[in-house]
Amino acid sequence: MRAKANIAFMKIAVVMSLALSTAASAQDKAQDNRTFSSGYRFVEMTGEELFGNVCQGCHMPDAAGAIGAGSYPSLVGNRNLEASGYPVYLVVNGRRGMPGFGDMMTDGQVAAVVNYLRTHFGNNYQDVVTARDVRDARR
């Protein structure tokens, strides 16, 4: 009788484990809605998506920057973002260790990520960068 109880307990434990692991896996997939670019151009369209998939690899998820194999400046409360043309220039052309992303982003994508940086992470620069501003800066 005890053996039957142990077998029943084991079956219940296996079923519960499978159910919990499936639920956890579904939750992980629901929270990880990032897009991944394939090819030479980024497919992300919002500033948040672009920052999350392009910029945060170096500047960190909280935009605090890092020092290690290189020096990645903090974007938190960064006064260099005040003049909108400067971050547009950096994203398009790069500088020092930062590559330029101008060939990989449309004018709208550059504007989106610059506007996101200028209005998040302790930055409150409300003048909006447009795709036309980026196009004009590329000339």
Residue spans of the language-model regions?
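The canonical Cys-X-X-Cys-His
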Residues: 47, 51-61, 113
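Bacterial N-terminal signal peptides that target proteins for export
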Residues: 2-13
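Flexible coil segments in periplasmic/lumen-exposed cytochrome c-class electron-transfer proteins
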Residues: 28-38, 107-139
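Stable alpha-helical elements in mature extracytoplasmic
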Residues: 43, 83, 87, 109-110
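Bacterial N-terminal signal peptides
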Residues: 11-21
